[in-house]
Amino acid sequence: MLDPERCRVARLSRDARFDGRFFVGVVTTGIYCRPICPSRPPRDDNVRYFPSAVAAAQAGFRPCLRCRPDSAPESPAWHGNHTTLHRAVRLINEGALNQASLGALCDRLGIGERYLRLLFQQHLGISPKAYALHRQCLFAKQLLHQSTLPIADIAHASGFTSLRRFNDAFRRHVGQAPRTLRRTPRAPSQDVTLMLAYRPPYAWEWLRDFLAARRIDRLEWGDEHRYGRHIQWGSASGHFTAVHVPERHGFRVTLSLDDLGALLPVVRHIRRVLDLDADTALIEAQLRRALPATFPLVEGLRLPGMWTPFEAGVRAVLGQQVSISAARGHVTRLVEALGEPTGDDGRQFPTAARIAASDLAFLRMPQARRDCLRGLAQAACDRRLDDDPRQWTALKGIGPWSAGYAALRGTSHPDIWLGGDLGVKRALSALGTVEPAHATPWRSYLTLQLWSL
């Protein structure tokens, strides 16, 4: 439940730490805003507070054109702690209902359509399809404000199959025609540049150094202020570069994709890789219950995501019982040998099919580890890999550490405790009393805090 007084103080002070944690509906104008909206604050008796943008929209409010709620970071708190609902929301945000049916989504979740509708009504007050349409319209609004894409391309990128359907849905959800948001003509560009926001603080220096120590040349790149890599999503391929802009509490992300139909899920994936939606104040309050009072907590620490669970699994196998530097060498050789070349002398991460078809003789490691890697790749080719990497321990050579690492970095699961990790063991030995159970459901962040020592 939202605390009205806390919300009032946050909106009057425009506290960026609350951005995306609630939204402000203004009764006199019929619009809803972020708590950081630069407009003159309305009177208390003209305000209603909502836990999410979708809740504000359901109540009949339209998004503000000045603070742009479509650009706000999300808060995982508003859809509760229900695991199935979390998965459903994540898949819908990645475009699961753009081209596929509700039945296909339910098959992926292992539940019936009626049960999924019930979950959405109970927790969100909206049907799954209505939620998906709301997300599509907000993403389209973000593209209209920030990109130079033609409106027809924006409709396609937002998951609409026709321009007419897009225009109708946009008018209903935003209250205006899409063309009215294009106030200033700009030269068109093949690339898409978006500002992706987070709630401060954000420990960019920690994340930057973590990624740099594991960066694979020609697949990834980075420097003091940016991180980028080549990516694939289904049949689409491209690359992105994210530049940290701390004064705006966000990243300026430039994307190049050969199929704009993949843009919505790719942007959602970039948000996950950079962990932009984490509520670090909430997380760190829980971690302090598990750690000694003198522990030097890294404020704003984020989960360093990988592009896919499969890539995370491959890197976990290649990192078994070796140093970070040695693991990086193994992954580099794999990418050089099997990664699909890109047009700019880069490489994509190797597909499961190419790894499964190779004898991997170029990898200097025990044969059992090569067999494990090929077994993982073959399972992916055969569609035998569970969506949750923690279930991969049935595969020969995949133990709890590898499965947990793949879940932590490949799906950004927030509650992975790698208690058997050597770095964690060393930290525990130095600290003495640590209570991992007290950090639930944020033990992934506890693991990373211990790695930071």
Where are the language model's segments positioned?
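HhH-family (HhH-GPD) DNA N-glycosylase catalytic core used in base-excision repair
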Residues: 1-453
